[in-house]
C-alpha cells in the first residue's frame, strides 16, 4: 500500500513541509490543499480555523482514504489539532515553532521567533517558550507581510528586498541574536535572503526535517511491486481566482498532476 498523506495550509508555504516529507517518503501518495479563500490564516479567528480544518479534511477524506493529515501551517497547528484528532481516527501531525531545538543550539541564549502575528500571540507558543526556553531571551517578530512576500516569490521568482528588510530591520543590529526560528512554513523559502540580511545569525531552524521524521515514524511505507491506479498526486484550492492557472503550473512543477477546486457544496 502507498500511504496517502494530505497536507494543507492557507497558501503554498506548506510545500516546504511536503518537500521534506517527500524526500523521506518518495513513494507515498500526496494530496495538498491550499485554502486560498481564507488566506492568510493569521488574519482569521480560531473558530474559523477549526471550522475550515474540519471541512477540508472531511471533504477530501470522502473521496480519498487518508492515512495521515499534516497541518502544514504553524498558525493553524496552534489551534486546530485537538478538534481534528477528536473527529478523525488517522494520525494528525502539526507544525509548531521549533522552540526546543532553537533553545538547545543557541550559544548566546538569544533566539528570534519569526512567525505570523497569529502564531506569535498564541498562548500555546508562550507555553512552549516557558517550557523549553526559560533560560533564553526570545525576540519575536509577527508578520503577515513576509507570508505575502513568499507567495509572491513562488509566483514570480522575485522577492521585494525593501519590504523584506522592513520586516526584519530590528534584528539587523541585534548584538546577541544567534538563532532564528522560521516559525511559518512559508519562511524557509526565503531562508537564503534572510541569511544575507542577518549575517550574525548562525542558525536558522526549519521544522521540515523534524516533521518528516515524525511522519515517517508514524507510517510504515511499503513500495508496491506494480504501479497502483488512481494514485496521482493532486492539489486542491478553495477559490478560483486570476492566479489559478499560474498556480496549477507551479503545483505541477512540485509534482502534482493537476489543481482542482475543492467544492464544499
From Swiss-Prot:
Pathway: Cell wall biogenesis; peptidoglycan biosynthesis
Coiled coil: none
InterPro entries per record: Asp/Glu/hydantoin_racemase, Asp/Glu_race, Asp/Glu_racemase_AS_1, Asp/Glu_racemase_AS_2, Glu_race
Keyword Ubl conjugation: no
Sites where the protein binds substrate: 9-10, 41-42, 74-75, 185-186
GO MF annotations in UniProt: glutamate racemase activity
Protein name: Glutamate racemase
Organism name: Actinobacillus pleuropneumoniae serotype 3 (strain JL03)
Gene name of the record: murI
